[in-house]
C-alpha cells in the first residue's frame, strides 16, 4: 500500500512534457510577438498561427503543424476562450505558478475525442476562412496584373501608331474622313428612323379618321325610315298597329284599322276592323280619262290584333266606284 501511494504521488508531481514546453514558449519574452500571456495572465495568445508554426513549433516539437498543437491543448484540458483570436486557457496554467502545472493531466480518451472533434470543426472553419481570404487576394493580384499589362501596352501601341503615321502621312486625314463619314451615315440612319416613325404615326391617324368616317356614315344610314316610324307607331299605338303593304306604284289605297278590345265577361279574344277605301283617278295610275279603271297598284295598311295571339285577316274586296268613295256605304 505504501508503494502504491508513493507511485501516485510521484505521478502527480510529474509534469507532462507538452505542458512544460508550452509554458516555456509562453513565458519566453523574446517570442511575445508570436505567443504571449493574456491580459489577466491566466491564458495565452497565439498572435500569428502561421509564423508561430514555422518559427516556434519546430524549436520545441518535432513538427510544425498548428492543428496538432491545438489538438494537444484540447487533450490536456485547454479551451479556446475568444472566438476572434487564438487564445487558450486552463485553470492550472497561470503565469508565475509553475507548481500548479502538475495538476494538468491528460484527459480520458472519450472526452479527448469529443473535444478534439469540436476543435477540429473550429480549425476547419478557420482554414476555410483563410482559403477565402487567399482567393480574394489572388483575384486582386490578377486584376492588378491586368491593369499593369494594359498600362505597359499603351506606350507600345502609341509608338506603333506614330510609326505608321510617319510612314503614311495621309493616315490621319483618312481616319478623320472615315470618322466623319461614319458620323454622317449615323445621322442619315437616324433621320430615316424618324421619318419611318412619323409616317407610321400618320398612317395610324388616317386609319383612325377613316374609322370615324365609317362610323359616321353608318350612323347616318341608320336614320329612322317611314317604315320604322310606322313600326314605332304600331308598337306604341293604343289602338293597334298599322302594317303597310305596297303593291304597285300607284293605285287605290286600302286602309284597315283593327282595334284591340277585350270583353270583361269572356276569356276569348275578339277583333274588330274598320276599313276605309278610296280610289285615285285613272290618270294617276297612268290612264287617260277621268273615270276609274282597273286597279294597277295597291297599298294596304292592315292592322289585326287578338287577345292571346295574332290572327292574320284577309283584306276585304274593294267595292266598285263610286261606292268606294263612301267607304263601303252611302
From Swiss-Prot:
Gene3D superfamilies recorded: Winged helix-like DNA-binding domain superfamily/Winged helix DNA-binding domain
Record-level GO cellular component terms: nucleus
PROSITE patterns: HSF_DOMAIN
GO MF annotation list: DNA-binding transcription factor activity; sequence-specific DNA binding
Sequence motif: Nuclear localization signal, positions: 191-195
Alphabetically ordered keywords of this record: DNA-binding, Nucleus, Phosphoprotein, Stress response, Transcription, Transcription regulation
Region Hydrophobic repeat HR-A/B, annotated ranges: 114-166
Tree of life domain: Eukaryota
Disordered as annotated region, ranges: 180-235, 268-291
Leader peptide range in chain numbering: none
Predominant subcellular localization, coarse grouping: nucleus
Subcellular location: Nucleus
Summary of subunit composition and partner proteins: Homotrimer.
Record's protein name: Heat stress transcription factor C-1
Organism per entry: Arabidopsis thaliana
Protein's gene: HSFC1
Amino acid at each position: 500500500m505504501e508503494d502504491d501511494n508513493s507511485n501516485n504521488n510521484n505521478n502527480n508531481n510529474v509534469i507532462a512534457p507538452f505542458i512544460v514546453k508550452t509554458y516555456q514558449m509562453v513565458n519566453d519574452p523574446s517570442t511575445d510577438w508570436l505567443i504571449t500571456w493574456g491580459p489577466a495572465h491566466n491564458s495565452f495568445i497565439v498572435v500569428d498561427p502561421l509564423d508561430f508554426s514555422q518559427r516556434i513549433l519546430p524549436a520545441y516539437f518535432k513538427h510544425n503543424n498548428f492543428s496538432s498543437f491545438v489538438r494537444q491543448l484540447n487533450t490536456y484540458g485547454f479551451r479556446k476562450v475568444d472566438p476572434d483570436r487564438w487564445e487558450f486557457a486552463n485553470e492550472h496554467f497561470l503565469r508565475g505558478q509553475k507548481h500548479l502545472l502538475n495538476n494538468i493531466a491528460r484527459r480520458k480518451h472519450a472526452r479527448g475525442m469529443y473535444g478534439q472533434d469540436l476543435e477540429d470543426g473550429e480549425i476547419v472553419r478557420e482554414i476555410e476562412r483563410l482559403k477565402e481570404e487567399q482567393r480574394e487576394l489572388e483575384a486582386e493580384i490578377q486584376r492588378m496584373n491586368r491593369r499593369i499589362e494594359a498600362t505597359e501596352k499603351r506606350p507600345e501601341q502609341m509608338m506603333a501608331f506614330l510609326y505608321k503615321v510617319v510612314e503614311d502621312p495621309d493616315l490621319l486625314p483618312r481616319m478623320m474622313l472615315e470618322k466623319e463619314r461614319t458620323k454622317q451615315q449615323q445621322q442619315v440612319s437616324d433621320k430615316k428612323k424618324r421619318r419611318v416613325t412619323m409616317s407610321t404615326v400618320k398612317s395610324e391617324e388616317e386609319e383612325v379618321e377613316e374609322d370615324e368616317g365609317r362610323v359616321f356614315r353608318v350612323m347616318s344610314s341608320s336614320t329612322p325610315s317611314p317604315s320604322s316610324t310606322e313600326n314605332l307607331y304600331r308598337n306604341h299605338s293604343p289602338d293597334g298597329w298599322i302594317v303597310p303593304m305596297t303593291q304597285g306604284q300607284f293605285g287605290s289605297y286600302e286602309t284597315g284599322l283593327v282595334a284591340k278590345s277585350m270583353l270583361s265577361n269572356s276569356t276569348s279574344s275578339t277583333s274588330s276592323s274598320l276599313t276605309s277605301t278610296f280610289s285615285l283617278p285613272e290618270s294617276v295610275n297612268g290612264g287617260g280619262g277621268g273615270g276609274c279603271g282597273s286597279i294597277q297598284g295597291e297599298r294596304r295598311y292592315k292592322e289585326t290584333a287578338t287577345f292571346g295571339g295574332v290572327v292574320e285577316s284577309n283584306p276585304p274586296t274593294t267595292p266598285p266606284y263610286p261606292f268606294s268613295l263612301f267607304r263601303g256605304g252611302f
